[in-house]
Amino acid sequence: MASQGTKRSYEQMETDGERQNATEIRASVGKMIDGIGRFYIQMCTELKLSDYEGRLIQNSLTIERMVLSAFDERRNRYLEEHPSAGKDPKKTGGPIYRRVDGKWMRELILYDKEEIRRIWRQANNGDDATRGLTHMMIWHSNLNDATYQRTRALVRTGMDPRMCSLMQGSTLPRRSGAAGAAVKGVGTMVMELIRMIKRGINDRNFWRGENGRKTRSAYERMCNILKGKFQTAAQRAMMDQVRESRNPGNAEIEDLIFSARSALILRGSVAHKSCLPACVYGPAVSSGYDFEKEGYSLVGIDPFKLLQNSQVYSLIRPNENPAHKSQLVWMACHSAAFEDLRLFSFIRGTKVCPRGKLSTRGVQIASNENMDTMESSTLELRSRYWAIRTRSGGNTNQQRASAGQISVQPTFSVQRNLPFEKSTVMAAFTGNTEGRTSDMRAEIIRMMEGAKPEEVSFRGRGVFELSDEKATNPIVPSFDMSNEGSYFFGDNAEEYDN
């Protein structure tokens, strides 16, 4: 964890964590991408998909989900032990869409998990290649972040729906490892901890016995991950308090919610990575591109260049706008769901709409949707500029933000002011500064009140032309400060239901 003095780059977390130089990191991330690409090509061959069908993002999602399910040890064990009617624990599958006589047809496929594992390992030189699996999990998580608002989940844990900018990675599975922990937002970590504490309150044995010891160490580990995301001493001290509590209860929940709210202004460090669907890596590999040899980075120009030269298609429902569908997927590809709209409009080079104004539902098609009226179209995933992804929250300051989302979590390391609604955030801090953490609370509130509207974050950082691979000439964009900054503004996005 960052605070433990073991600052490893996120690429190192994706690799084996050995200290590597940039070239080695690029090669090993490239190797991971190669493996995903080779696996995808093989699956398309198995399923006899045409080139067009193989580039359909819905088919990609099904194939990705199958391999993730095949390697989900815990769930597989659970399914073996609790057999449910009509579910074969040894099989996995999903909808595959094919073009037949000028129409899209849905076919439900079923495969042995063992067979899928074999194909995956074969594509990855015999390894389990957990990093490749995590990479796909993060892509699914980024897609969920761009598509759904987690209002219900926030309210259930006693948090406020306006804190949605803190919820990056809230749908990532537990098994996503260090790379997964790096991309989780402050709100996501707080929510996981609150759920844990609530179980402890309701179940006397939760913290006891052999299992309780494991639970306790998981709790402390999560506290440390969250602590590592905070950038101020007072917020970190507060996390120490929560972690050291002998019997975590309502006081800890209060402290956690307080620290989450404070992160709207005193932002945490959250990593951002451009994770693309497997149907982007597959065709690139089959065209002869060698990712391991060329090297690849998830936080630099590489994903932008790859998307410039990729054709990805999507099924479109009758009343959906293909441009809006493209925006949704573009945001997911760059992990930009909580980024400032003004900024990624600039990078993408097209006007970007807030979620509530998008005429598009999620990318996945439900099994009961009528296929007769489905069309397909090309997703426009190209960009005008590229920018380096950030893993810090940027320094903090104010500007008017909106009724829905009241803060941003920056994705790109580009100079701008960071909008949030100070009066709204501060209103949440009335009263309660007593108790064990009162001095920390007072200190945090003081820092928040001192945050200034005119401060600029990521000073001097800019976007780059796509021809500028070495990032030599930063272009610092200028923004209309009066413009709306947040994506979930006054929103009607669907809820995420597992």
From Swiss-Prot:
InterPro entries: Flu_NP
Chain intervals for the UniProt region annotation (Disordered): 1-21
GO molecular function, one term: RNA binding
Pfam family, one: Flu_NP
Role description: Encapsidates the negative strand viral RNA, protecting it from nucleases. The encapsidated genomic RNA is termed the ribonucleoprotein (RNP) and serves as template for transcription and replication. The RNP needs to be localized in the host nucleus to start an infectious cycle, but is too large to diffuse through the nuclear pore complex. NP comprises at least 2 nuclear localization signals that are responsible for the active RNP import into the nucleus through cellular importin alpha/beta pathway.
Xref: SUPFAM superfamilies: flu NP-like
Protein localization: Virion; Host nucleus
Record text on subunit structure and interactions: Homomultimerizes to form the nucleocapsid. May bind host exportin-1/XPO1. Binds to viral genomic RNA. Protein-RNA contacts are mediated by a combination of electrostatic interactions between positively charged residues and the phosphate backbone and planar interactions between aromatic side chains and bases.
Segments carrying motif Unconventional nuclear localization signal: 1-18
Comp. bias intervals (Basic and acidic residues): 8-21
GO term, biological process aspect, one: viral penetration into host nucleus
Protein name: Nucleoprotein
GO cellular component, one term: viral nucleocapsid
Organism: Influenza A virus (strain A/Shanghai/31/1980 H3N2)
Modification(s) after translation: Late in virus-infected cells, may be cleaved from a 56-kDa protein to a 53-kDa protein by a cellular caspase. This cleavage might be a marker for the onset of apoptosis in infected cells or have a specific function in virus host interaction.
Keywords: Capsid protein, Helical capsid protein, Host nucleus, Host-virus interaction, Ribonucleoprotein, RNA-binding, Viral nucleoprotein, Viral penetration into host nucleus, Virion, Virus entry into host cell
Intervals of motif Bipartite nuclear localization signal: 198-216
Family as reported in the entry's similarity comment: Belongs to the influenza viruses nucleoprotein family.
